[in-house]
A protein has these predicted regions:
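N-terminal Rossmann-like FAD-binding beta1-loop-alpha1 element of flavoenzymes
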Residues: 6-35
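Conserved flavin/dinucleotide-binding core of flavoenzymes
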Residues: 48, 102-103, 321-436
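Active-site/ligand-binding neighborhood in enzyme catalytic cores
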Residues: 114-240, 261
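Glycine-rich FAD pyrophosphate-binding loop
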Residues: 25-51
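Dinucleotide-binding Rossmann-like beta1-alpha1 core, especially the glycine-rich loop
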Residues: 52-130
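Feature captures the FAD/FMN-dependent oxidoreductase FAD-binding
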Residues: 70-103, 146-152, 225-234, 239-249
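Conserved Rossmann-like nucleotide-cofactor binding loop
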Residues: 16, 41, 265
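Mid-domain catalytic core of redox enzymes
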Residues: 27, 236-352, 356-366, 400-402
Length: 436
């Protein structure tokens, strides 16, 4: 592309969209960039809300970490010295025990017999893996890699809870994204079996978080770089996209190029002339909604960051003490917690009921007592987690191929339909814009 005096549309202005605008302006300083965002409020899944002196990350628990040192340095640099560094204190709640995360590193806290059984299963499973094995689906990957004990106690119930689907209907593709799910290593297992603490999943064993303003500050820092140079149409959803000659028309705005950072099904629905097979492929892209329940507590937080909860009786799959991410997220002596609940697409959530169930779950786990609860809020994101169904790759490829032919480049979690953290999104957007 020879882009100097060119007009580019950015479709969707969450984390991927705001980064795309920034990289476009660096690459083509003369470009005119117009951004469409359906929400009046900017931030996407990196949104935070302040309620009575408590700050909640309303898109779920997000922290800054990466196994890519350059990406990590760039994202932390965005915060301009306003980033706090933490050593991860994450746990899996098993019965009354807090097992340090990753689970296979944390088993040293279990009684010796139980430890021996789970690690015995795991080693046996690893010894049986044939060379060149590829998992047929997520259930196959869990059972083959971790053995029946860890699968049954933790990974199956936890993953069924977050994905809300039978695990033999979820592809194992996403566990091949390096840095997405920790896989056990034998020396670590021997130490764990002997009851020696070890650290796993080193990429996020240290993480960063904004000093003030919640995780939204990460988004704001990227926004501040482009705000004066981009025409941001907040509260304007992408309703219509069509080709006119060699250009694209987005909601009646004519552009030379579009960078899509919005959910693919909504984008394809905006094209009146998309071929039927592309429309069908986009409709088959599955996802879960996420409801985030924020709870303000009149007590200090324990020395923990986030906790995975495989227990099927509890509605949320994870809760996080966001006031431990930054002390400015709660008044002194009090704490702010968020609990995350997924729902299949198309389900109309009853937020009042989910708030009540989340509080019940926290009481049941002994995380809080009724008298500690000051107030409870809930936020819904229709697009929470992209799902890796078994036909995910072919549907995604069909949609992306057709979009490229139309002159639309797709980026980010929702444009690429990948379960990416903010670091993977950063790298994807940067590389995509550099290749234009």
């Amino acid at each position: 592309l020879h882009l100097l005096a060119v007009r580019v549309a950015v479709l969707g202005f969450g984390w991927a969209g705001v980064l795309a605008a920034g990289f476009l302006l660096e690459r083509f300083p003369g470009a005119e960039v117009v951004a469409f965002e359906k929400s009046r409020r900017l931030g996407g899944l990196l949104s935070s809300a302040e309620v009575n002196g408590f700050t909640f990350d309303v898109g779920g628990s997000h922290v800054i970490f990466s196994n890519d040192k350059a990406v990590l340095a760039e994202v932390v640099a965005l915060l301009g010295g306003e980033a706090l560094e933490h050593r991860r204190r994450a746990y899996v709640r098993l019965g009354d025990l807090f097992v340090p995360y990753p689970f296979e590193n944390g088993l040293h806290v279990l009684p010796p017999e139980e430890r021996a059984e789970l690690i015995g299963d795991l080693v046996e499973a690893l010894m049986k893996i044939p060379p060149g094995w590829r998992p047929r689906h997520l259930l196959d990957w869990i059972e083959t890699t971790f053995g029946s004990g860890i699968a049954r106690r933790y990974l199956i119930p936890y993953n069924e809870k977050i994905w809300k689907r039978p695990l033999d209907q979820i592809s194992a593709d996403w566990v091949y994204i390096p840095g997405r799910l920790p896989v056990p290593d034998v020396k670590t297992l021997v130490k764990t079996a002997a009851g020696i603490p070890t650290v796993g999943y080193v990429e996020n064993s240290r993480f960063y978080y904004p000093r003030r303003g919640g995780i939204q500050r990460q988004y704001q820092a990227a926004l501040e770089r482009v705000r004066d140079k981009v025409a941001i149409r907040a509260g304007e959803a992408v309703k219509e996209v069509r080709r006119r000659g060699g250009r694209l028309v987005v909601n009646r705005v004519e552009v030379d190029l579009a960078v899509a950072a919005m959910p693919l099904p909504d984008l394809i629905a905006a094209f009146s002339d998309a071929p039927e097979e592309v429309v069908k492929a986009a409709e088959r892209l599955d996802y879960n909604q996420v409801v985030v329940v924020g709870v303000a507590l009149d007590r200090p937080a324990p020395d923990q960051h986030w906790i995975y909860v495989p227990d099927r009786r509890i509605v949320f799959h994870r809760y996080a003490w966001v006031s431990n991410y930054s002390p400015s997220n709660a008044p002194p002596g009090r704490s702010a917690l968020i609990a995350e609940i997924t729902l299949p697409r198309g389900v109309e959530p009853d937020l009042e009921r989910l708030k009540a169930e989340a509080v019940e779950g926290l009481l049941e786990l002994g995380v809080a007592q009724e008298r500690d609860v000051l107030h409870v809020e809930a936020w819904l994101h229709r697009y929470g987690y992209p799902l890796y169904t078994l036909d995910h790759a072919q549907n995604r490829d069909a949609v992306l191929r057709w979009l490229r032919e139309q002159g639309v480049v797709a980026v980010g979690r929702w444009g690429q339909w990948h379960y990416w953290n903010t670091d993977k999104v950063y790298k994807n957007v940067k590389e995509t814009i550099a290749a234009l």
